[in-house]
């Protein structure tokens, strides 16, 4: 396993504040229906911790008042709209689809902000298909996280692999011929019978990897847009209850959440989507502007804004974004991403057909890659949102 970074995990990266409080710089949430993630944690003895709040239930602020009943009715209207749209959900934008809803303005504003935040792009640049995750969101769930940090499964798997993992070893060249695969890194040359490219989409379509892809596979991968987002961490100075609030003006949500039976994790976390909002809030510089906005959104919380921090991914050379999205009018032939191409197989969350953008998608892609190379190994289980 050749890893360019000095750590395993990629966009699953658990870190700590100076007082030891866990923060998640990347992936964070687990859903009960994510069967492969739940099963993997169970096999590795890694506990899931209930948060006392729902990843799906975010109280909208900043727009027209809207009730829980109105939001529930809006989601029902979305489901009806999807049944009507069919394949047209790939042709029109999220913005256009929301305007078709006969719902209160507050509902439509909340839905647009939610999807722009989660999908990491403006609503005009997202195919209406992205609304499906909101339409199918479960009601009143207590969302779980990995109690010891989102990268715990990665660290556990890395411990099993031991010295077979090579850290800080970026690939600079690679080739495939009749004799196998040759990979040149900054440190050594490696040869193998097959290769699995487990890379984010922006990286796999760049050299030296792009030249290895069949033309139609490169075209399929290139069809996806790249999403951008940032995370915020602000230590809590006082007490708080688990909560989730969506700022509908600025495409971000913030939450306070339990760490299972240990009680509240003493930090307010946030997630902001779409590059225009990241630029507006200057998140690449620091978290000051964002933290000031949070003070208006959550005046009820006592927060240590001087210690606020952010994490961005668009400026990370090994990520260049958070995940992918489908643009209006584009219908990526993504089935090609889940097939074996001679000695080459792709992996990575963006290749999954159900859980793209989630740790579940990454796990499923790895299982699929292993099964494609060795059919005696099980493929991932059937999945649904």
What kind of feature is each model-predicted range?
Residues 21-87:
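Dinucleotide-binding Rossmann-like beta1-alpha1 core, especially the glycine-rich loop
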Residues 9, 41, 98, 157, ...:
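Generic structural signal for small/hydrophobic residues in well-ordered secondary structure
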């Amino acid at each position: 396993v050749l890893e360019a970074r000095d750590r395993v995990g990629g966009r699953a990266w658990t870190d700590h504040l100076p007082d030891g409080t866990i923060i998640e710089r990347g992936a964070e949430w687990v859903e009960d229906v994510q069967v492969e993630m739940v099963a993997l944690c169970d096999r590795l003895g890694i506990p899931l911790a209930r948060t006392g709040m729902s990843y799906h239930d975010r109280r909208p602020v900043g727009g027209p008042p809207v009730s829980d009943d109105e939001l529930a009715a809006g989601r029902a209207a979305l489901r009806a709209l999807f049944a009507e749209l069919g394949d047209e959900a790939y042709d029109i934008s999220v913005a256009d689809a929301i305007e078709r809803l006969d719902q209160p303005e507050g509902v439509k504003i909340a839905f647009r902000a939610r999807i722009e935040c989660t999908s990491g792009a403006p609503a005009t640049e997202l195919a209406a298909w992205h609304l499906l995750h909101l339409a199918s969101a479960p009601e009143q769930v207590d969302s779980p996280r990995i109690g010891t940090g989102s990268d715990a499964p990665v660290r556990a798997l890395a411990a099993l692999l031991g010295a077979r993992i090579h850290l800080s070893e970026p690939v600079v060249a690679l080739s495939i011929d009749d004799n196998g695969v040759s990979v040149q890194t900054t440190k050594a040359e490696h040869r193998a019978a097959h290769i699995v490219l487990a890379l984010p989409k922006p990286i796999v379509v760049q050299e030296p990897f792009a030249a290895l892809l069949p033309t139609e596979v490169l075209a399929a991968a290139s069809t996806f847009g790249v999403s951008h987002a940032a995370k915020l961490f602000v230590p809590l100075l006082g007490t708080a209850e688990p909560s989730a609030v969506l700022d509908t003006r600025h495409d971000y949500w913030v939450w306070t959440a339990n760490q299972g039976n240990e009680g509240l994790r003493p930090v307010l976390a946030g997630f902001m989507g779409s590059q225009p909002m990241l630029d507006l809030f200057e998140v690449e510089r620091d978290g000051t502007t964002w933290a000031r906005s949070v003070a208006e959104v959550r005046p009820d919380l006592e927060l240590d804004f001087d210690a606020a921090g952010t994490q961005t991914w668009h400026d990370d050379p090994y990520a260049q974004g958070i995940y992918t999205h489908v643009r209006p009018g584009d219908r990526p032939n993504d089935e090609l991403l889940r097939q074996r191409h001679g000695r080459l197989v792709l992996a990575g969350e963006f290749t999954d057909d159900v859980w793209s953008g989630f740790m579940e998608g990454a796990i499923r892609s790895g299982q699929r890659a292993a099964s494609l190379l060795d059919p005696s190994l099980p493929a991932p289980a059937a999945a649904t949102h």
